[in-house]
Amino acid sequence: MASSINNSSQPTVPSISNNSHGDSFVNEGPPSNFKNNSLTSSTHSSTDHVNVLPISQDKEMDISSPVKKQKASYSNKSPNKAPIQKSRGSSLKSHLETESQQTPVKRRRRKATIRNVDYCSACGGRGLFICCEGCPCSFHLSCLEPPLTPENIPEGSWFCVTCSIKSHHPPKHPLSIWSQLYDWIDSQNPSQYRLPDDLVHYFHGISRGDTGAYKETEGEMDTDEFSALPTGSSITNLAYCGYCSKPSMGACWVYGCQLCDTFYHKNCKEHAKKCSHDSIGKKGMRVPKNAVVIRTPLVLDTTSNTLNPKVMISGWQFLMGEFPSDELLYFPRLPVSCLYKVSEDGLIKDFLYAIGIEAKKFNNERKKRELEVIPPDVKSALLPARTHPNLPIALRTLFNKART
């Protein structure tokens, strides 16, 4: 019995034949979508067109499985569609597009307009200013170094000393101990002398405004919160009497001992012997230690009617002028246990006095050094003239020392 395909009216189906080695192979027929094929087993007749399909006995054909097709013919894929391969350029482009979507675009911002202050950055006053183009500073023409006049104002943009140093970088001073200090001084704008902030804000009742001017801050203090009390000011540094343990009350002031940290009221001064200092009666009392005292040079007490008119008093006491002269020597009068104000005249005189002392010391040392480098023959010629009336006293003294 042989297997046959009855397909008289339809095209032939693929036939399976064996080669010389006994392997079967497929002869492709019509397309795979061809329908109405019947596969039967019957005795062949001479009238039908029969294609005999010899099947190897050792290899049976699985009729239920579909016929395998070659890869090169009748592919299910469209022949016009080739596999898409991404080039390197396209992958790089897609990568850049993805990265640009994740990273925000940086836009160039316009430079903000600088708004200069409406007061002089050197003295804090008002008036006609010249404004810096690189910072908010403004200056009076007379406050600059060197000063300017309305006739020689530079044309175009003007920059202060600090901005000019940052942009131009001038040569620095030779390396020395003070070179960094000199460089810092050269890079600073001119500024008026101001008291340190610790000293300005220490005294209760006064402060300094934005322009540098002093202002009074008197008013009722809110004591509901502990933070309302200024811990670093003079109002919390009270001096208490060593006898009655009370601070200054009205006209009863507190004074401190010069040899220890004990304080007494004026009415309790007879109890000052508790300090056990023998010289307490001679040196009197002093200002409380907790109060800040500006030390100025001692001057003669010309206003005192005491037997010893050459008693030296402090310049701070001398400048307090509002108190009677009999209390200047022993009991400098204070409204409370702390100082509220610092005399401006006392600061100026103290500063000038310190400069004068340093200048005298410097001049004496300079003259002494100049005398030391004089050759011996020249010095011997100058020595006979040491008693000349026009020769300064300092040089006369130096000549005497050199002679000896």
UniProtKB/Swiss-Prot annotation:
Residues 1-22, 87-104 have a biased composition (Polar residues). One of its GO terms (biological process) is regulation of transcription by RNA polymerase II. Gene3D superfamilies: Zinc/RING finger domain, C3HC4 (zinc finger) (3.30.40.10). A zinc finger (PHD-type) spans 117-166. It holds the Pfam family PHD. The keyword Phosphoprotein applies. The modification Phosphothreonine is found at residue 47. This is Uncharacterized protein C16C9.05. It comes from Schizosaccharomyces pombe (strain 972 / ATCC 24843). The lineage of its organism: Eukaryota, Fungi, Dikarya, Ascomycota, Taphrinomycotina.
